[in-house]
Swiss-Prot record:
SMART domains: MUTSac, MUTSd
Any one GO molecular function term: mismatched DNA binding
GO CC annotation: cytosol
Binding residue positions for ATP: 634-641
Family label: Belongs to the DNA mismatch repair MutS family.
The entry's keywords: ATP-binding, DNA damage, DNA repair, DNA-binding, Nucleotide-binding
Protein's job: This protein is involved in the repair of mismatches in DNA. It is possible that it carries out the mismatch recognition step. This protein has a weak ATPase activity.
Protein name: DNA mismatch repair protein MutS
Transmembrane segments: none
Taxonomy, superkingdom: Bacteria
Length: 891
């Protein structure tokens, strides 16, 4: 019975196929193998898409949708793109999260019976990009596979991740608890996620394109063996991955998928890194966003810490910087080695110094990505010429590094890494033309002298005219026929023409080709041989060049690991040089590390804000076992958030390995950085602003340790005053008594300023401001003690709130304060303003306020006329005036 059903199904399929044209049968067969992928089907100079693919591509790529003929009674909808412009269309598709199968003609149209043979040669997906036209120079593209491990009760116990940068060959694994998945994906930012049907719901929304993969691809035993085969090892012990379970299953699925999209082995995936949470300073998603490491809160790329630090001369250095910022090591050893290298670069003599080194680095190609394309046999001619020129420049670059490496072990290691693979430069120099064409099909890629046959074919093609002149001269001399001519036409090819009166002088080796009324045309063995070569020389030269180029790619494969080593060394050297340039240009210093708990920053500055303003007020920050929590008060816009963020950024920069914007800085161990700064409704997740705020606070209270740095900004403001105050008080107490972490706690709740009376480890500081009438001048200086006013109405006035609203607010504030005093209720919010008299009606002009003497003095002076000593004296004078009111000054 089963056999009969199978036979009838096959017969039905054959009948259905017979209703289509042979070409459409071929297309539908290929499409059936890639049902969820747009198939780009090569037809001559175009890639065509059909049926639903055509409709989708027309909509996404703004293509013209046409309709030609019918197949099996169905109109054939078509959309196409020129083959030479396909990369730009693929780039657009990838941005939409789509994948495309590139189907090429592999048969010879001249010998094909029926449709030319075609097959899919590569599949372009969001996570498997390697072509330069599809990639951003300064960011990596990751393909990630996710495997959920379950315990005996069937409950998810861990999640295994494997992610691959196909352009470089870097493969990483990690195993983590299910509740850590969101933070891990936020850090990795994969472009494409592979998951089995039953685990797709585990992936948070908006994390990348999701591709369904058969569950059996995630088999742990098969994945472990596939990893061993890929890395050519008997065991994964050397990589620390033998004990992993779900991560190895994820790696197996990832390697199957990546190899299938490329249609070949992944020769450049030769190393493995297992990431452990304890290696890096923990940064949860909200911390990465709030500190604006690589993206602003508005979603732009600048101004961020990354945009400020990225003065790298190579794309490799820029990508490494992005990785370092998201992976600051907990151990200070790595950071200290980087600081030592930066110091050596800054102290180097001018002839081998920083500027000279960076000038040389600007000539370096993207060796990392070129190597990836080499391994996949997709490198283009200019990739190879760029690689050759880079390797040729390495000896001089190594000499510069060697001159300064004696003072920094890291530079010595990098100098050794910059040695090109033996024989690689020689091969590239001999084989590749000085300035090759962009594509092999254009010719002119292989250098002259590399292959005698190719040189001969080129000579024939290029020197055809000269050969004919030389032959004509020789034949005239040999035959004595003075008017003998050697010519060519498209019908008969090359020939020797002799007039009728001279035919008796024709040699025996002449063979008649054509008889005319007044002349005979002949061919000789030599001319026939030349004709065969000349007429096919260009075509044969291109074919020979293609074969030679493929041979060069194959010959370079053994050098892949050496090229990867060079790329890694160049990227790190470039990034350290960029750190040195930033330190020199922006007046940054090398931080110090200690095993003692504490953070000490002397005259610290916010690196990004400082670059955006003309003058930045530097501030100190001291946290230690006796001073674990700073209660920060002061007006809105006074600089509380900036001060908190700059402390976290300076600490992060120190552990990343950069110098820091401060006069001096000293750090004890830091394991995690948490931020609870600002919030908004999570509409997609169905969470209110207050719920988002409490969720972030809960994560901090549950996970912060004595080595964690916590930033809390106005916690509790999203609910009623009493609820908010109670929560803020309890959270601050818990951070002091249980977590005992470094904490910067900004608040407007007056009651919290009494916390140091209960906990000596807490201290009050405030951001200073000067009131002028109903206005305010922010001084942005951090001073000891709590603030005495919040200046909320003054800030509202600065924001442009209409004057009638401000006056009404002042009247109501006075009423509330009087009511509060009469009821003897505690003051809940910062801070009680001085008694306020009734404001005049809205149609009456306000009484003129007495200008504050500090502001008057500021308005009198011309900053351009001040000498350094005068400026210092003036600063002391303003400080004295600021502490006194107008009445004191008048006295």
């Amino acid at each position: 019975m089963a056999t009969q059903i199978d036979a009838s199904s096959e017969a039905a399929a054959a009948t259905a196929a017979a209703q289509h044209t042979p070409m459409m049968q071929q297309y539908l067969r290929i499409k059936s193998e890639h049902p969820d992928t747009l198939v780009f089907y090569r037809m001559g100079d175009f890639y065509e898409l059909f049926f639903e693919d055509a409709e989708k591509a027309a909509r996404l790529l703004d293509l013209t949708l046409t309709q030609r003929g019918a197949s099996a009674g169905t109109p054939i909808k078509m959309a196409g793109v020129p083959h030479h412009a396909v990369e730009q269309y693929l780039a657009k598709l990838v941005k939409f999260g789509e994948s495309a199968a590139i189907c090429e003609q592999i048969g010879d149209p001249a010998t094909s019976k029926g449709p030319v043979e075609r097959k899919v040669v590569r599949v372009v997906t969001p996570g498997t990009l390697t072509d330069a036209a599809l990639l951003s120079d300064k960011s990596d593209v990751f393909l990630l596979a996710l495997c959920v491990g379950h315990n005996k009760r069937g409950v998810a116990s861990n999640i295994g991740l494997a992610w691959l940068n196909l352009a470089s060959g870097a493969l990483r694994l990690a195993e983590l608890a299910p509740d850590q998945l969101g933070a891990a994906l936020e850090r990795i930012r994969p472009a494409e996620i592979l998951a089995a049907d039953g685990t797709i719901e585990s992936v948070p929304a908006g994390m990348g394109a999701i591709t369904r993969v058969p569950a059996w691809h995630f088999d742990i035993a098969s994945g472990t063996q596939r990893l061993c085969d890929q890395l050519e090892v008997a065991s994964l012990d050397g990589f620390g991955a033998q004990a992993l379970t779900s991560a190895n299953g994820a790696a197996g699925a990832l390697l199957i998928y990546a190899a299938a999209t490329q249609g070949q082995q992944l020769r450049h995936v030769r190393s493995l890194k297992v990431e452990n949470e304890s290696e890096y300073i923990g940064l949860d998603p909200s911390t990465r966003r709030n500190l604006e490491l690589t993206e602003t809160l508005r979603g732009t790329e600048s101004p961020t810490l990354y945009s400020l630090l990225d003065t790298c001369c190579t794309a490799m250095g820029s990508r490494l910087l992005r990785h370092w910022l998201h992976h600051p090591p907990r151990a200070s050893v790595a950071a200290q080695a980087r600081h030592q290298a930066i110091g050596a670069l800054l102290d180097a003599p001018p002839n081998a110094g920083l500027d000279s080194l960076r000038s040389a680095l600007r000539q370096i190609a993207d060796v990392e990505r070129i190597t990836g394309r080499l391994a996949l046999l997709s490198a283009r001619p200019r990739d190879l010429s760029s690689l050759r020129d880079t390797f040729a420049a390495l000896p001089a670059l190594r000499e510069r590094v060697a001159e300064i490496a004696s003072n920094a072990a890291a530079l010595g290691r990098l100098e050794a890494a910059l040695e090109p693979p033996p024989g690689c430069l020689d091969l590239l120099t001999r084989a590749i033309a000085a300035e090759p064409a962009a594509m092999v099909r254009d010719g002119g890629v292989i250098a002259r002298g590399y292959d005698a046959e190719l040189d001969e074919l080129r000579d024939i093609s290029e020197n055809c005219g000269q050969f004919l002149i030389d032959l004509e001269t020789r034949e005239r001399a040999r035959t004595g026929i003075s008017n003998l001519r050697v010519e060519y036409n498209k019908v008969h090819g090359f020939y020797i023409e002799v007039t009728r009166g001279q035919t008796d002088k024709v040699p025996d080796d002449y063979r008649r080709r054509q008889t005319l009324k007044n002349a005979e045309r002949y061919i000789t063995p030599e001319l026939k041989t030349f004709e065969d070569k000349a007429l096919s020389a260009q075509e044969r030269a291109l074919a020979r060049e293609r074969a030679l180029y493929d041979g060069v790619l194959q010959a370079l494969l053994p050098h892949i690991e050496g090229c990867q080593r060079v790329a890694s060394g160049l990227a790190e050297l470039d990034l350290l040089a960029a750190f040195a340039e930033r330190a020199r240009t922006l007046d940054w210093v090398a931080p110090e590390f200690t095993d003692e708990i504490g953070i000490e920053i002397d005259q610290g500055r916010h690196p990004v804000v400082e670059a955006q303003v003309e003058q930045f007020i530097a501030n100190d920050c001291a946290l230690n076992p006796e001073r674990k929590l700073l209660l920060i008060t002061g007006p809105n816009m006074g600089g509380k958030s900036t001060f908190m963020r700059q402390t976290a950024l300076i600490a992060l920069m120190a552990y990343v390995g950069s110098y820091v914007p401060a006069k001096a800085a000293r750090f004890g161990p830091i394991d995690r950085i948490f931020t609870r700064i600002g919030a908004a409704d999570d509409l997609a997740g169905g969470r209110s602003t207050f719920m988002v705020e409490m969720t972030e606070a809960a994560a901090i209270l549950n996970d912060a340790t004595p080595h964690s740095l916590v930033l809390m900004d106005e916690i509790g403001r999203g609910t009623s005053t009493f609820d908010g105050l109670a929560l803020a008080w309890a959270i601050a107490r818990h951070l002091l008594s249980h977590n005992r972490c470094y904490t910067l706690f900004a608040t407007h709740y007056f009651e919290l300023t009494q916390l140091p009376a209960e906990f000596p480890q807490a201290a009050n500081v405030h951001l200073s401001a000067v009131e002028h009438g109903h206005g305010i001048v922010f001084l942005h200086a951090v001073e000891e003690g709590p603030a005495n006013q919040s200046y909320g109405l003054q800030v509202a006035q600065l924001a442009g709130v209409p004057a009638p609203v401000i006056r009404a607010a002042r009247k109501h504030l006075a009423h509330l304060e009087q009511q509060s005093a009469a009821q003897a209720t505690p003051q809940l919010d910062l801070f009680a303003a001085p008694p306020v008299v009734d404001e005049p009606e809205c149609n009456e002009p306000p009484a003129a306020a007495t200008p504050h003497p500090a502001l008057e003095r500021l308005l009198e002076l011309d900053p351009d006329d001040l000498k350094p000593r005068d400026a210092l004296d003036l600063l002391y004078e303003l400080h004295t005036l600021a502490r006194s009111g107008p009445a004191d000054a008048q006295r």
